[in-house]
Curated annotation (Swiss-Prot):
It holds the Pfam family EF_TS. The keyword Repeat does not apply. Keywords: Cytoplasm, Elongation factor, Protein biosynthesis. Its main location: cytoplasm. InterPro entries: EF-Ts_dimer_sf, Transl_elong_EFTs/EF1B, Transl_elong_EFTs/EF1B_dimer, Transl_elong_Ts_CS, UBA-like_sf. It comes from Anaeromyxobacter dehalogenans (strain 2CP-1 / ATCC BAA-258). Signal peptide: none annotated. It is found in: Cytoplasm. GO terms for molecular function: translation elongation factor activity. Associates with the EF-Tu.GDP complex and induces the exchange of GDP to GTP. It remains bound to the aminoacyl-tRNA.EF-Tu.GTP complex up to the GTP hydrolysis stage on the ribosome. Gene3D superfamilies: 1.10.286.20, DNA helicase RuvA subunit, C-terminal domain, Elongation factor Ts, dimerisation domain. This is Elongation factor Ts. GO terms for cellular component: cytoplasm.
Amino acid sequence: MAEISAKMVQELREKTGAGMMDCKKALTEAGGDLAKAEEVLRKKGLSAAAKKTGRAATEGAVASYIHMGGKIGVLVEVNCETDFVARTEGFQGLVKEIAMQVAAASPRWVRREEVPADVVAKELEIAKAQAREQKKPEAILEKIATGKVEKFYSEFCLMEQAWVKDDKKKIQDVLTDAVAKIGENIQIRRFARFVLGEGLEKKQENLAEEVAKAAGLQK
């Protein structure tokens, strides 16, 4: 078992706001892994972030982000508890980071609970069909399919996506860190992502004809 140092306990305490003994117990349970210990505290509701999640967050900000010369645009709404925090540089920076994440990672939902049941059922069905094609035993099809759906969530649910600036963190971790630092409940409510020309059928032209037109060789 890894030795739990006072420095590790202090680091976890500063990050989560939990008590010293709770931090030490969490680190012991997590085998000295700080990230896992933080998760242990969150699950037990002992971290500062966990204690704040039940509080009403009705203030906040709507931010926009335009990427690639106007080809991708994002609107995102992030809520906090007070207008004072909503106007701080730290909160505004967080909202901007979330908007950039949406632009870069193309999530479809904020959290897994928003994914329609029929979409989940279809993903399970596809995963099982693929496993059967690979001659996997029927007894483990459900386990394989569940694993595939978990991967689906991590790809398309914003809160479970790897952060584009540090893939060791999920967006949920980024939010948890912000809650602990800012001191208020913070929630990502919704987002919209726009891609120029998405869903439109582009006219396909012959490359040779295009070159000829550009050179003035065709009328």
